[in-house]
Amino acid sequence: MSKKVGMISLGCPKNQVDGEIMLSKLADNGFEITNDVDGADVVIVNTCGFIEDAKKEAIENILDMVELKKEGVIRKIVVTGCLAERYRDEVLSEIPEVDAVVGIGSNSDICEVCEKVCSGEENIKTFGEKTCLPLDGKRMLTTPSYYAYIKIGEGCSNNCTYCAIPSIRGKYRSRTPESILEEAKTLADGGVKELIVVAQDTTRYGEDLFGKCALPALLTSLSKIEGLEWIRVLYLYPERLSDEIIDTFANNDKIVNYMDIPIQHCNSDILRRMNRRGSKEELTALITKIREKIPDVVLRTTLITGFPGETEEQFSELSEFVKEMKFDRLGCFAYSQEEGTPAAEFPDQVDEEIRKKRGEIIMEQQYNIFEKLNHDNIGKTMRCVVEGYDGYTDSYYGRTWRDAPDIDGSVSFTCGYELNEGDFVDVEIFDVNEYDLIGEVI
């Protein structure tokens, strides 16, 4: 009888892709993949370990599995992902009920590890060189069938002083265009209509292979794949967002005019101490240029409040910048003092409560901005993907092209004929409900 394996995948889409590759390898090697961990022979907790909140979530999930193991509901626990890589020794020593810890560079050993724990081996640790996984064969998608993430690179070479990712996942390494395009075609042939391009920094793609950014050429090639309706790009580093990249967005109908540009801050001194380049003036010029070239662009950004040494004046500068720029989408995180990062040793650490309060202020501001921008959508017709049907309200729900999965809003709409999950329809917006839109198919 084949062994049952379940997975709990946490964190970002990049980690989710790693999990999908592991699931595919397990299935190809005779394991039965189950969505319900109850009764599983092995539960893999694919963790994030990027910031404190992510670590807490990962540990809570591991401890939940420990309880199930004690109750006899599951047999074995394997921990993978960033937490496993970053705290390889601590996981087994602090949580001895864990049977195996698999580092990012050893994900391809997942089948062997699961075989070993099922046969009774304990305290397994396996780690290897931090490289891209071989992506031969299909992935077992954990997303709905109509969209998928595609990872074009691994690791990061930006070395922001607050970030542990380079130490966890290594320097930036691009996949070859041939590998990416082959995978994208396989996904499209399997019914994927929205392809979401991810890496720690998508604007760095190709620099290590060709000596220059190859993202525009890659996106152009992806747009020629039959069956893809939308190509969405996340994690665009602002200082490398060139005119060529902007023009590629502006001139290609398949690439949705949605730019995810994490700026983190606008104050020049804070950016310098973050080891990020640019200034408020340069960021303003970039955003202005993007909006001039792509009038209907949706801009998403991410900010950090309470970085070491951030004064009230510097925070006020950030607050005013947010009001002035009016980002369409914005996420704000209180600075997390991560051990092993340069910023963790900086003097003038900001009190944790102040960090959080500043983040709350930014998000309150952004809500007011978003509410106004959302009302501006009333009367517009937008292309949407159908994600499901709500019998309680007798309406469908989905996303507009302006919204990425999981992190942005949704739209509910009625239709005079039956729709299926993954269909693309034009919806006229006639009302809003906080972050979400309401409309009808035309």
Segments and roles (model prediction):
Residues E345-I442:
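Terminal RNA-binding accessory module
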Residues C12, G206-G227, R273-R277, Q337-N368:
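Radical SAM enzyme [4Fe-4S]-AdoMet core and its adjacent flexible, acidic
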Residues V5, V42-V43, A148, L195, ...:
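Conserved beta-strand core positions
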Residues M1-Y205, E244, M259, E281-E292, ...:
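Proteins enriched for Cys/Gly/acidic motifs involved in redox and nucleic-acid/cofactor modification
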Residues C160, I180, V197, V233, ...:
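Conserved, mostly hydrophobic/aromatic
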Residues I77-G81, R86, D189-F315:
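Conserved SAM/AdoMet-binding glycine-rich loop
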Residues I8, T80, V198-Q200, L234-L236, ...:
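Generic beta-strand/beta-sheet core signal
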